[in-house]
From Swiss-Prot:
Probable glucose transporter. It comes from Saccharomyces cerevisiae (strain ATCC 204508 / S288c) (Baker's yeast). This is Hexose transporter HXT8. SUPFAM superfamilies: MFS general substrate transporter. GO terms for biological process: carbohydrate transport; hexose transmembrane transport.
Length: 569
């Protein structure tokens, strides 16, 4: 490895949170507006004085090996997707209702109350949020791969408890919490490992494979529910739960072939292994100059971080490194992903389509699962072709239109003679069609892109902590939507769609003003862009310092005198 001196700034480049606990976010539409000195310090800190690392791009077919490895990591999304696809059917199956529900003497049938339904469906997300915040740090201690294997075992323990439940709903409830803890940790560690391993020009596509696996699992979950619904015993729900062991074992087996993150290996001083990992991912020889230069940059960055001491949770509120602004943006994006209303359909799809008069709502759920899964293949192309911002903006606009039609038809046309009378078949079919189109738009845009954004936004020093917080925000909103949806739909029915419509309209404006474009940049270049103070709506024109020519004017990207409405249209 070539000798390299790391020039550190005399003062730490991060700043602890102010005493009042809340840093100012004035002019927060800027990624930042740093001084010349701050930019200089940051460049030194990241080793940017070195020559540009040139990793030659190859055709997609040349990356078959790294693509398969990333698919093994992305298979972690199967855990969460399988739960989403199966739980929506469980709460409508006769044996499940008999064991864990209440008996209605007047109707001579078993049922789940709104409270119990909400808790059983949504508590998985609470466990996932706990796993994000507390177990995902195993990836910093034992490595991303070993950390993943440990949390998969935790997930399996939760599944055992659920299968062993006889007639106590709270035992099943506890099992879902523990399984959620494992799945939540996986949802941080797996995308992190993909982002740190994948070549930059196909990183977005490989990260989108996470959502592909989620949607594939949802579809298979729907199919499994349909296949077991004719049984009258616990086969209805225990067989789908038992299949979780197969998914866990497949992922553990896959992880034995996946190389460790080169960034983590550099962090623990295993330089030669880091070279081998980076070379394998980029189809280069270990001695290739691009490999040596990239690892040298990582070493310089890690040495700078070590000189500043151990990263603390307080550092998440740092303004000089712009971590607080990045964290705020990713928390908002992850929250808005849930507020698009996707899990309203995925958690309660079977129940929703019963209400619109479908003879077999399980069959309708399978149709939704097919649309959801097939749509994700478009995202593998669009996320790196169109970019992150355009995908989110296009998705927000189209989903808003779909939700307006869905809610309006449900409110005005579904029950022309009142709720006590049969629903309109034509209106019911219309709601299903626009639900399918909504899911298509979601799966092509917001579904995968949010995982891409949170995986490539943060510096290595605080990446694990920040991704944990951002993912936990997503899961907590998932819990709130899952828990309160039965109560809300009982009170306002299809007016609920207008709530999601408002959130989608807001998300369009938020993305435009606060989310930068990171397509085609290395993780270190993403850091540099944030420190350069580029306006998000001008970020597509930003060029890293190592590739700028004499005509490049970075200041033009930091200011915009146009009124906000002229910036958008």
């Amino acid at each position: 490895m070539t000798d390299r001196k790391t020039n550190l700034p005399e003062e730490p480049i991060f700043e602890e949170a102010e005493d009042d606990g809340c840093p100012s976010i004035e002019n927060s539409s800027h990624l930042s507006v740093p001084t010349v000195e701050e930019n200089k310090d940051f460049s030194e800190y990241n080793g940017e004085e070195a020559e540009e690392v040139v990793v030659p791009e190859k055709p997609a077919s040349a990356y078959a090996t790294v693509s398969i490895m990333c698919l093994c990591m992305a298979f972690g999304g199967f855990m969460s997707g399988w739960d989403t696809g199966t739980i929506s059917g469980f709460v409508n199956q006769t044996d499940f209702l008999r064991r864990f529900g209440n008996y209605s003497h007047s109707k001579n049938t078993y049922y789940l109350s709104n409270v119990r339904t909400g808790l059983i469906v949504s508590i998985f997300n609470v466990g996932s949020a706990i796993g994000c915040l507390f177990l995902s740090k195993l990836g910093d201690i034992y490595g991303r791969c070993m950390g993943l294997i440990i949390v998969i075992v935790v997930y399996m323990v939760g599944i055992v408890i659920q299968i062993a439940s006889i007639d106590k709903w709270y035992q099943y409830f506890i099992g879902r919490i523990i399984a959620g803890i494992g799945a939540g940790s996986i949802s941080v560690l797996a995308p992190m490992l993909i982002s740190e391993t994948a070549p930059k020009h196909i990183r977005g596509t490989l990260l989108a494979c996470w959502q592909l696996m989620v949607t594939f699992a949802i579809f298979l979950g729907y199919c499994t529910n349909y296949g077991t619904k004719t049984y009258s015993n616990s086969v209805q729900w225990r067989v789908p739960l038992g299949l979780c062991f197969a998914w866990a074992i497949i992922m553990i087996g896959g992880m034995t072939f996946v190389p460790e993150s080169p960034r983590f290996l550099v962090q623990v001083g295993k330089i030669e292994q880091a070279k081998a990992s980076f070379a394998k991912s980029n189809k280069l020889s270990v001695d290739d100059p691009a490999v040596v230069a990239e690892i040298d940059l990582l070493v310089a960055g890690v040495e700078a971080e070590e000189a500043m001491g151990t990263a603390s949770w307080k550092e998440l509120f740092s303004r000089k490194t712009k971590v607080f602004q990045r964290l705020t943006m990713t928390v908002m994006i992850n929250s808005l992903q849930q507020l698009t209303g996707d899990n309203y359909f995925f958690y309660y799809g079977t129940t929703i389509f019963k209400s619109v008069g479908m003879n077999d709502s399980f069959e309708t759920s399978i149709v939704l699962g097919i649309v959801n899964f097939a749509s994700c293949f478009f995202s593998l192309y669009s996320v790196d072709k169109l970019g992150r911002r355009r995908c989110l903006l296009l998705g927000a606009a189209t989903m808003t239109a779909c939700m307006v039609i869905y809610a309006s038809v449900g409110v005005t046309r579904l029950y022309p003679n009142g709720k006590s009378e049969p629903s309109s078949k034509g209106a019911g079919n219309c709601t299903i069609v626009f639900t399918c189109f909504y899911i298509f738009c979601f799966s092509c845009t917001w579904g995968p892109v949010c995982y891409v954004i949170i995986s490539e936004t943060f510096p290595l020093r605080v990446r694990s902590k920040c991704m944990s917080v951002a993912t936990a925000a997503n899961l907590l909103w998932g819990f709130l939507i899952g828990f309160f949806t039965p109560f809300i739909t009982s009170a306002i029915n299809f007016y609920y769609g207008y709530v999601f419509m408002g959130c989608l309209a807001f998300s369009y404006f938020y993305v435009f003003f606060f989310v930068p474009e990171t397509k085609g940049l290395t993780l270190e270049e993403v850091d540099e862009m944030w420190m350069d103070g580029v306006l998000p709506w001008k970020s597509e024109s930003w060029v890293p310092a190592s590739r700028r020519d004499g005509d490049y004017d970075n200041e033009k990207l930091q200011h915009d005198e146009k009124p906000f409405y002229k910036r958008m249209f």
